């Protein structure tokens, strides 16, 4: 092969060619025959927005590296791709796109429009995934809005309902007034903001006194059902058994005691409202208090708010504070920072409303979830603590019903006569109770039913992803369950990870996966979360256009699981530069890749091969431990420095020499082995580049090749130590040539290497390589130190010193120095610290000398030094 047959530059535009070839040949398909050990990845199903972002890239690069690595290790890998379709954002987008409200059309039509939008978004995202070279098996694609997937979701509901793990009840729930739906506690995000702590006078009945309440939510005074203080707070002892009047609204409430009150906050007296927060819920339940609904589902004040009915929460708050001040009830306002629960989708502050909803009995399953989490391997390990801490904070059951349309229907009907709940038979699934009937007669004799209009939380869909991939509930599902790996972001540990473990334990009694690898978030180059408002968003397409998928993948692989990572153009550019460096090395190597018999490897060959075997062991271990950054950095360092900068340069003279054919063949064979091994080590991270190179030197796809074998017999620590020293010597001579403005291939007349006996024995086998690499005519090795002398061969008077200091004597001094022997002048100053000239004393400050080193043979030499071990190199130009 000649390098003319290979393009001069690596062209990342060819990536698309390989992607099409991989798809056509279906090389990533899961066989499932049982002839190979299986490896199952529980792939996260993204929400189909229509475009992927850098967070997706980071997550999928992690799992794609694992999938490719495991395939090469001999596993039959099931790497599916799913789509978590249902949810409010799609409904909002459909309303915007078609300029409608969901109430303007039938539920069926609205759902059809949502499906249509989602299908198009999936198509676009699928193309983007494929453009990044991800190796999913699209034969195992799952889509949560399809009848088959909804059947599984509904079946999981029925079985958990049958086992008493799902129930319907009237309870306080987190409610988003913007989305007009209940949300789970895990979907509440807390943000810090500034508000006012209002100090309000509450009159005491039958006394000319008052209790001062500090509250950040005066708009809930209409729903005040008690005033609570700490049992040990003596300030309120006199008000025991008295009623407290709520200003503006007039209801009289009891003063109660509870140890949860913080007597140091505000005034120590707190109003209990239904409901300001979770603590209110706890107090209402503990003390048997009434419930007043002051806020409706849309965030407006109800009839209970009296004259404030119909105002928004914010409007009501402002008006009540104004009225309290006007009527003398408001004593003061203080600014305060507080954490406010918001909806994770729209960031609207949540309310707590009492609603009839469907719940998963989370608290019954917490012990099983914790046990399963302990059995799993977490990468990084400390991420397990996040899940365990979350399970320890679970006060409420999981509210799984939503007041939306585009989601999996709850398979339930209510008898029109007696209200009895009827769940679907498993054989009927999937069903839509708003459209389908139960086909039964109620125990009361009625055949009229009302279908449940609420739908399931989308986490009810995605939390059975490992079961769906395995084919549950078919008996054969246990062949593919539990999964081996769950890759996901740390931001959804308390949702997707928690719910999946909980649901799979409830449905199967088994943990859903053996290992879980957590990726971090991707920030902008400015260190902030990527957002359009900051202008720091980088779309994957921008990188693909200029640098290709592999450069982007190298950036992602350089991060550490669990840690947030800033996107950095410099890292992408470095990855691209590395690929071009490797490509150029490959072009050179390609002209020397001839078919040779096996010949004995030379010392420099043995050095690189020993280091290569260490590389194989280290990269294999790193990938087994999901330490992607260590694996990639090690491969890049080896290829760039050990292989390209050192070994290839050190064997060029052998490749072009006809004097020793076996030496040339040994170098050629070594080049082939190192190239092939490095390509396979790099293949999981840079699949396009390695495929492109492999097509010139091998057969078939590199991704169907096996992982490089670690051959212990090739590892030789002694040859590595010796080779490292030889490489250091070559590097020192190379630096000497560079600093001397000499071409690196410029010939040197001779070189003598002086060192101790042990180091001399180490260097001896590499003398030919040192001489050949640096074009040295005669090279020798001496145990000991050289006999060298330093001689001044030129001197130059420093006029800027002599003129001002010696004035009228300066011309005579210059004249004398011009005719003097430079070395005699130099020795005189060295001996006495000065020399007398025309009655004046001159030092080294007055004269510059150019010196030469004279070697053992009496010739001028250059002397180079290495410190560890001590090596002196005497160069004759």
Curated annotation (Swiss-Prot):
One of its GO terms (molecular function) is valine-tRNA ligase activity. Pfam families: Anticodon_1, tRNA-synt_1. A motif ('KMSKS' region) lies at residues 529-533. Its EC number is 6.1.1.9. ValRS has two distinct active sites: one for aminoacylation and one for editing. The misactivated threonine is translocated from the active site to the editing site. PANTHER family: VALINE--TRNA LIGASE, CHLOROPLASTIC_MITOCHONDRIAL 2 (PTHR11946:SF93), VALYL-TRNA SYNTHETASES (PTHR11946). This is Valine--tRNA ligase. It comes from Methanothermobacter thermautotrophicus (strain ATCC 29096 / DSM 1053 / JCM 10044 / NBRC 100330 / Delta H). The lineage of its organism: Archaea, Methanobacteriati, Methanobacteriota, Methanomada group, Methanobacteria. The gene is valS.
């Amino acid at each position: 092969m000649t390098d003319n047959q290979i393009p001069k530059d690596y062209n990342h535009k060819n990536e698309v060619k390989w992607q099409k070839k991989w798809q056509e040949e279906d090389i990533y398909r899961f066989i499932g025959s049982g002839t190979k050990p299986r490896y199952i990845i529980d792939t996260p199903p993204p929400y189909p927005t229509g475009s992927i972002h850098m967070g997706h890239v980071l997550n999928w690069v992690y799992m794609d590296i694992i999938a490719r690595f495991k395939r090469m290790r001999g596993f039959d890998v099931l790497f599916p791709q799913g789509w978590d379709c249902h949810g409010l954002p799609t409904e909002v987008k459909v309303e915007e796109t078609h300029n409608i409200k969901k109430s303007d059309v039938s539920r069926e039509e609205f759902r059809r429009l949502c499906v249509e939008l989602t299908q198009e978004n999936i198509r676009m995202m699928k193309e983007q995934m494929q453009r990044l070279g991800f190796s999913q098996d699209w034969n195992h694609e799952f889509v949560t809005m399809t009848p088959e997937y909804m059947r599984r979701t509904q079946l999981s509901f029925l079985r958990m309902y049958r086992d008493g793990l799902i129930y319907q009840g009237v309870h306080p729930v987190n409610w988003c007034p913007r989305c007009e739906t209940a949300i789970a506690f895990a979907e509440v995000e807390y943000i810090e903001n500034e508000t006012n702590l209002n100090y309000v006078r509450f009159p005491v009945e039958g006394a000319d006194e008052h209790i001062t309440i500090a509250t950040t939510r005066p708009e809930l005074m209409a729903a005040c059902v008690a005033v609570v203080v700490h049992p040990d707070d003596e300030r309120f002892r006199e008000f025991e058994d008295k009623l407290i009047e709520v200003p503006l609204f007039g209801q009289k409430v009891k003063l109660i005691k509870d140890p949860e009150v913080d007597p140091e906050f505000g005034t120590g007296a707190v109003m209990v409202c239904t409901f300001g927060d979770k603590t209110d819920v706890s107090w209402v339940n503990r003390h048997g208090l009434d419930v007043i609904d002051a806020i409706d589902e849309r965030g407006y004040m109800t009839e209970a708010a009296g004259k404030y009915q119909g105002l928004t929460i914010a409007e009501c708050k402002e008006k009540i504070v104004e009225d309290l001040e006007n009527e003398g009830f408001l004593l003061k306002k203080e600014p305060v920072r507080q954490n406010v629960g918001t909806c994770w989708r729209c960031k609207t502050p949540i309310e707590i409303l009492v609603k009839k909803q469907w719940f998963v009995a989370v608290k019954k399953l917490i012990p099983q979830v914790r046990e399963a989490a302990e059995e799993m391997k977490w990468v990084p390990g400390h991420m397990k603590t996040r899940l365990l801490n979350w399970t320890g904070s679970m006060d409420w059951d999981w509210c799984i019903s939503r007041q939306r349309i585009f989601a999996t229907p709850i398979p339930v009907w209510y008898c029109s006569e007696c209200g009895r709940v009827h769940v679907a038979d498993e054989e009927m699934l999937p069903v839509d109770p708003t459209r389908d009937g139960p086909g039964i007669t109620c125990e009361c004799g009625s055949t009229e039913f009302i279908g449940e209009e609420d739908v399931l939380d989308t986490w009810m869909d995605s939390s059975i992803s490992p079961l769906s991939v395995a084919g549950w509930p078919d008996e054969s599902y246990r062949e593919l369950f539990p999964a081996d790996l769950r890759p996901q972001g740390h931001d959804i540990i308390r949702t997707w990870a928690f719910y999946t473990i909980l649901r799979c334990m409830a449905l199967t009694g088994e943990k859903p996966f053996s290992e879980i690898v957590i990726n971090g978030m991707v920030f902008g180059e400015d260190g902030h979360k990527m957002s359009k408002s900051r202008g720091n968003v980088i779309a994957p397409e921008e990188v693909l256009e200029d640098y290709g998928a592999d450069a982007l993948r190298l950036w992602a692989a350089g991060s550490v699981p669990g840690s947030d990572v800033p996107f950095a153009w410099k890292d992408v550019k470095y990855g691209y530069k590395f690929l071009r460096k490797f490509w150029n090395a490959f072009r050179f190597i390609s002209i020397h890749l001839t078919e040779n018999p096996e010949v004995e490897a030379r010392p420099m060959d043995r050095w690189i091969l020993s280091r290569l075997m260490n590389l194989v062991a280290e990269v294999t271990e790193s990938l087994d431990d999901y330490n992607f950054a260590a694996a990639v950095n090690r491969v890049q360092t080896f290829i760039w420095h050990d292989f390209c900068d050192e070994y290839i340069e050190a064997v060029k003279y052998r490749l072009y020499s006809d004097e020793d054919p076996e030496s040339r063949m040994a170098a050629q064979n070594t080049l082939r082995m190192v190239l092939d091994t490095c390509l396979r080590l790099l293949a999981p991270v840079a699949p396009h580049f390695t495929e492109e190179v492999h097509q010139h030197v091998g057969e078939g796809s590199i991704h169907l090749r096996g992982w490089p074998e670690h051959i212990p017999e090739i590892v030789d620590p002694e040859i590595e130590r010796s080779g490292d020293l030889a490489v250091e010597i070559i590097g020192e001579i190379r630096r000497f040539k560079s600093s001397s403005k000499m071409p690196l291939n410029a010939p040197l007349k001779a070189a003598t290497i002086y060192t101790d006996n042990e180091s001399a024995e180490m260097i001896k086998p590499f003398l030919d390589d040192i001489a050949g690499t640096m074009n040295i005519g005669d090279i020798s090795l001496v145990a000991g130190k050289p006999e060298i002398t330093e001689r001044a061969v030129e001197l130059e008077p420093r006029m800027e010193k002599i003129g001002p200091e010696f004035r009228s004597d300066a011309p005579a001094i210059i004249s004398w120095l011009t005719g003097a022997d430079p070395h005699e002048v130099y020795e005189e100053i060295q001996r006495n610290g000065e020399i007398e000239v025309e009655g004046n004393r001159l030092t080294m400050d007055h004269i510059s000398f150019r010196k030469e080193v004279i070697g053992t043979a009496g010739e001028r030499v250059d002397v180079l030094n290495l410190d560890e071990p001590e090596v002196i190199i005497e160069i004759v130009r």
